[in-house]
Amino acid sequence: MTSQNPTQEPENNDHLIISQDSQHPANLIPELCAKFWHLGWVTGTGGGASIRKDDLVYLAPSGVQKELMKPEHIYVLDITKQLDPKQRIYLRSPPNLKPSQCTPLFMAAFTKRNAGCCIHTHSKWAVLITLLLESAPNTTMFEINNIEQIKAFGKGYTKSGNLGYHDTLRIPVIENTPHEEDLTEYLEEAMEKYPDTYAVLVRRHGVYVWGESVHKAKTQCESLDYLFQIAVDMKKLGLPWLSDVKPIA
């Protein structure tokens, strides 16, 4: 298991999380987490979010009720100084709190996909999809097409434009582990195997979603949760997730 023991630089650098700008990461993360809590995505301190701004990464902490989170709860690290993943160096650490075990997974999105934001939810719809897939022919891939909301997703890393209505959205599934940080290597493997994906489902656990900006990550996370809900209802009605709808000439 990867150690999450943080190394704190001498000065706590509280100035990094103090800003009147509503779009500053230290203000945005608590706002987003409160919204996600109301959606049922981050119940009981589960889940989280992280934003990268230039070389600085802002992270929600572990163990804080998401609807009560404040800027002073936010961790900050410099992505260029993380030479040893087993010993992260934080520029700013809130007192009496612990870094999230999601941190190495968020870092994977930033370093391997140049993401600007990564969101982790425990959405019941994400969990249900992974359960439904346990009895599917392909247990490690969620696929759906011919649904309008698919247009919210980009075509893939380094590619321009978004998916179309008739395209197939594919989200890989990895198995859960007893400790969240131990998911990192499996998440990274999924990123390598499926370079066009913007999300990875974790069996009986939740989903990680990222994007090049906060706007894109949030849009894709909301759209994916909508598609998960649609897919669960489709399964109840005996409707296939993949269909052969002919384009209108």
UniProtKB/Swiss-Prot annotation:
Q: Which biological process terms from the Gene Ontology are attached to this UniProt entry?
A: L-methionine salvage from methylthioadenosine
State its cofactor.
Zn(2+)
GO (cellular component) term, any one: cytoplasm
**Pathway recorded for this protein:** Amino-acid biosynthesis; L-methionine biosynthesis via salvage pathway; L-methionine from S-methyl-5-thio-alpha-D-ribose 1-phosphate: step 2/6
Q: What reaction does this enzyme carry out catalytically?
A: 5-(methylsulfanyl)-D-ribulose 1-phosphate = 5-methylsulfanyl-2,3-dioxopentyl phosphate + H2O
Annotated residues for binding of Zn(2+):
120, 122, 205
So where does substrate get bound? 102
- A Pfam family cross-referenced in the UniProt record is Aldolase_II
Q: What does the note under cofactor report?
A: Binds 1 zinc ion per subunit.
The record's annotation in InterPro entries points to: Aldolase_II/adducin_N, Aldolase_II/adducin_N_sf, MethylthioRu-1-P_deHdtase_MtnB, Salvage_MtnB_euk
Q: Indicate where this protein resides in the cell.
A: Cytoplasm
Q: Where is the active site?
A: 148
> Which EC number applies?
4.2.1.109
The protein's UniProt keywords, in alphabetical order, are: Amino-acid biosynthesis, Cytoplasm, Lyase, Metal-binding, Methionine biosynthesis, Zinc
What is the documented function of this protein? Catalyzes the dehydration of methylthioribulose-1-phosphate (MTRu-1-P) into 2,3-diketo-5-methylthiopentyl-1-phosphate (DK-MTP-1-P).
Q: What is this protein called?
A: Methylthioribulose-1-phosphate dehydratase
Q: Tell me what organism the protein belongs to.
A: Botryotinia fuckeliana (strain B05.10)
Q: What is the lineage of its organism?
A: Eukaryota, Fungi, Dikarya, Ascomycota, Pezizomycotina
**Gene name?**
mde1
